[in-house]
């Protein structure tokens, strides 16, 4: 690749690009995915054929192909990738739930009582297998991220209650099997954001929006919180996550601060990659927590944050250096809410389209 004039990324060694041709290439072992103008991409593969034996195909509008087990296609609006209905049917069949009654949400909040009876060996094996399949699916179905994260935390010793939650998620999956991840501009409040440095549409200037949220002490057993986030490049959704925070937050403000730190790390990774490609990048971080935003904008620990580890205050330095701009978003508009807890149907129906799922 280097001999052909392509630059290899330092932060992500799977990425290559050629700025003179405006071609980007992602390498996964012996699978390649290249983007650019049709003629340039064709010339790239023909040149590569001189060095290695390969099969390649140009994906045109309304074409379909498979890359890393995912079905890829392009329509008049955007780029679509999905695991397809067949994968969902396989999971339902494995769980013997092909005839199960569908439900409208991925899960419900824990009740006061739960069945903590451990699963037997066969049930445990089935649980691990299905949850693993759901985790793979969740890369394209961000509405499943929180539920699969919670189920995966119980892989070592699942109970009857965990199996009940798994069945609920599978019933939701049955009712939403046709949802696809479509990479196209989404209707979010981000597009109204003021660019702090230059014109919004200046050539090679991009804005990264990272929306974050947390659910303070959401785990009844450990009292740990969950961080969630979604990363958009301009108005295009690119990444999302749901993670249990590694330490116990002593307040909701602290939990929100940790969520902002996690979101900043995700955004800066992509910003650095884009800057390697000679783009100018601005990072806006959105939170619905006034106290969390206040902690991010100050320098040093407040009276209630003196116990927080030093590494988390790197966020404050990023803000002070204008490497990242904190922004307030209304809680009801925050898509990251879906990554932190089970939500009611009305919230799910409103926010799910902002994830690129349609």
Q: Which positions does each model-derived feature cover?
A:
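Long, low-complexity, charge-biased intrinsically disordered regions
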Residues: 1-358
């Amino acid at each position: 690749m280097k001999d052909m004039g392509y630059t290899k990324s330092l932060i992500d060694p799977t990425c290559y690009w050629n700025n003179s041709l405006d071609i980007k290439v992602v390498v996964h072992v012996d699978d390649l995915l290249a983007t650019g103008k049709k003629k340039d991409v064709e010339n790239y593969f023909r040149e590569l054929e001189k060095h290695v034996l390969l099969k390649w195909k140009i994906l045109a509008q309304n074409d379909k192909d498979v890359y890393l087990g995912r079905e890829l296609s392009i329509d008049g609006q955007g780029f679509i990738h999905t695991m397809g209905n067949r994968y969902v049917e396989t999971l339902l069949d494995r769980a013997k739930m092909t005839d199960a009654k569908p439900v409208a949400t991925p899960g419900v909040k824990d009740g006061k009582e739960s069945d903590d009876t451990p699963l037997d060996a066969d049930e445990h094996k089935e649980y691990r297998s299905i949850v693993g399949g759901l985790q793979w699916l969740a890369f394209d179905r961000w509405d499943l991220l929180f539920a699969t994260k919670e189920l995966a935390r119980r892989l070592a010793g699942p109970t009857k209650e965990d199996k009940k939650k798994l069945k609920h998620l599978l019933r939701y999956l049955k009712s939403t099997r046709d949802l696809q991840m479509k990479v196209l501009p989404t209707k979010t409040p981000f597009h109204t954001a003021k660019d702090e440095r230059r014109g919004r549409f200046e050539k090679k200037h991009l804005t990264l929006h990272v929306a974050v949220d947390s659910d303070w002490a959401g785990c009844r057993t450990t009292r740990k919180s969950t961080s969630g986030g979604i990363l958009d490049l301009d108005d295009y959704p690119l990444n999302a996550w749901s993670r249990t925070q590694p330490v116990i937050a002593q307040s909701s403000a602290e939990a929100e601060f940790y969520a902002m730190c996690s979101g900043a790390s995700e955004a800066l990774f992509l910003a650095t990659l884009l800057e390697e490609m000679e783009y100018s990048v601005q990072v806006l971080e959105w939170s619905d927590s006034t106290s969390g935003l206040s902690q991010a904008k100050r320098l040093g620990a407040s009276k209630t944050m003196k116990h927080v580890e030093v590494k988390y205050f790197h966020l404050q330095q990023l803000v002070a250096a204008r490497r990242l701009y904190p922004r307030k978003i209304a809680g009801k508009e925050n898509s990251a809410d879906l990554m932190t807890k089970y939500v009611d149907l009305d919230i799910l129906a409103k926010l799910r389209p902002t994830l690129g799922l349609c």
